[in-house]
Design a protein with these regions (language model features):
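Short, glycine-rich nucleotide/cofactor-binding loops
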Residues: 18-30
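Classical nucleotidyltransferase
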Residues: 13, 66, 83-171
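Residue-level signal for inorganic ion chemistry
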Residues: 28, 69, 150
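Short, surface-exposed acidic-centric catalytic microdomains
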Residues: 32-86
C-alpha cells in the first residue's frame, strides 16, 4: 500500500474496493467511526457481517445485524454477509483491501495473525485504522453487558441500535 498525504486526508492509491469485516453483534459507534473513515478513503466500502446464519449465536441474528448496520451507515456503503472464508469472498468480489479498527495493542495482537493469514492465502492487504480515543473503551460485548443489567448505553451505539439492544433485553 502506498499511502500519501494530500492536505489532511490520507489517500491510498490503487485501492478502490474495501471490506470492513466483523460479527457486528451489534454494530457500535466505534465500528461506525471506522466504517465512515474507510468510506472517505476508498471508492467502495462494504460492511461484511461474518458468521453462520444457521447457528444463531449472539444477541442479534445475521439479518438483524445487517438491517441495523444499514440503518446506521451512509446509503453508499454496501452491507453483505459471508459465512465462509473471508479471502474467498474478497477474491470473488474483487476486493482490494480489508479495513479493521484497532482500540489497543490487544486488538493488534488478535488481528495481526489473521491479516497475515489472509495475505498468505490471497495476497490481500489489511489496513488498520486506530479507533478514535472517545470510542476506545467500546466493544459490543461490554456494551451488551451494560445493557443487559439496565445500564446507560447512550453514546455507545447508533440510536436505532441502542433501541434494539434495549428491546432485546426487555424480553
Amino acid at each position: 500500500i502506498m499511502p500519501s498525504l494530500v492536505g489532511s486526508e490520507m489517500c491510498i492509491r490503487d485501492r478502490t474496493k474495501a471490506v470492513c469485516p466483523g460479527s457486528f453483534d451489534p454494530v457500535t459507534l466505534g465500528h461506525i467511526d471506522i466504517i465512515n473513515r474507510a468510506n472517505q478513503m476508498f471508492d467502495e466500502v462494504t460492511v461484511l457481517v461474518t458468521g453462520n446464519p444457521d447457528k444463531p449465536s449472539g444477541l442479534f441474528s445475521v439479518d438483524e445485524r445487517m438491517k441495523l448496520i444499514r440503518q446506521s451507515v451512509d446509503p453508499s456503503i454496501k452491507v453483505d454477509f459471508c459465512s465462509g472464508l473471508l479471502v474467498d469472498y474478497t477474491t470473488h468480489h474483487g476486493v482490494d483491501v480489508l479495513v479493521k479498527g484497532l482500540r489497543s495493542s490487544l486488538d493488534y495482537e488478535y488481528e495481526l495473525p489473521m491479516a497475515q493469514m489472509n495475505r498468505h492465502l490471497s495476497g490481500i492487504d489489511t489496513v488498520f485504522l486506530l479507533t478514535d480515543e472517545k470510542y476506545g473503551y467500546i466493544s459490543s460485548s461490554l456494551c451488551k453487558q451494560v445493557a443487559k443489567f439496565g445500564g446507560d448505553v447512550t453514546g455507545m451505539f447508533p440510536d436505532a441500535v441502542g433501541r434494539a439492544v434495549k428491546e432485546k433485553y426487555r424480553k
